[in-house]
């Protein structure tokens, strides 16, 4: 059994709204990346967000998935999805 198998994934409504505006091909890739988070939230092109406790961003192509890892509750909360621009961070 995987060490990360018991993580619960929660996705904010803002993320679902953002996904509707993204082209289908990119949307499918992003959804796959989000669904893989509970398998191992620390895998992939990750960077911890400065000034934020337990907040991370994962790079998926030209998009960024922002999420918080609540280690005690074993919850991953995806709270933002943005296309990478000079104003993303």
Regions found by a protein language model. Name each.
Residues 34-58:
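A short, surface-exposed loop/turn module that caps and links secondary-structure elements
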Residues 1-9, 17, 21, 28, ...:
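Enriched for short, Lys/Arg-rich terminal
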Residues 12:
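PIN/NYN-family metal-dependent endoribonuclease catalytic core
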Residues 27, 31-34:
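Short, well-structured alpha-helical segments
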């Amino acid at each position: 059994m995987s060490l990360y198998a018991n993580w619960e994934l929660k996705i904010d409504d803002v993320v679902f709204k953002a996904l509707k505006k993204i082209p289908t091909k990119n949307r499918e890739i992003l959804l796959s990346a989000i669904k893989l988070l509970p398998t191992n939230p620390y895998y992939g092109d990750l960077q911890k967000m400065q000034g934020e406790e337990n907040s991370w961003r994962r790079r998926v192509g030209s998009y960024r998935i922002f999420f918080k890892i609540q280690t005690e509750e074993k919850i991953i909360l995806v709270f933002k999805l943005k296309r990478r621009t000079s104003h993303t961070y």
